[in-house]
Amino acid sequence: GFEGTVDTVKRAMKAADCKVPVALHLDHCRTYEECVQAIQAGYSSVMIDGSSLPFEENVALTKKVADYAHCYGITVEGELGKLVGEEGNFKVEGDPESAQTDPDQAKEFVERTGIDCIAVSIGTQHGVYVAAPHLNIERLKKIHDVVDVPIVLHGGSGTPKEQVQEAIRN
């Protein structure tokens, strides 16, 4: 469980005489209850992934997690848009372009949920790439222009270094 993971990390840090701060992040959690359990166990940040839900349901779930987490000083990442591909037991299929994050929705999502950072879809995917990825830098620029929180890109493994560097610059 979450407590066991936190305990293992703390023991490893102590054994290594770790001198730097360590963050323990719960990635791609799909339920409010699991986010609460992770926060109570000692995680320092959580990602609530309601990206498979309709927009209004994603907003409601993400806001609920952010409201709870912020009471404990915990950082929350929300996700809007879908990354095609596979991650763990989850598989998302479809047209990568239509699954990308809409900048106007991103702005509304951030404002309504109170998240600390937003994971967006601009052409990356989870799992192994069948064809070379192409990041939609113009879409990223538009999102960056309208949100006031850090932007997170998931599914970057296999993305050419030049595209990652261009995304960072924009």
Regions found by a protein language model. Give the residues of each.
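Alpha/beta enzyme core
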Residues: 3-19, 28-150, 161-170
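Thr-Gly-centered strand-to-loop micro-motif
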Residues: 153-155
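Short acidic/histidine-rich active-site segments
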Residues: 157-159
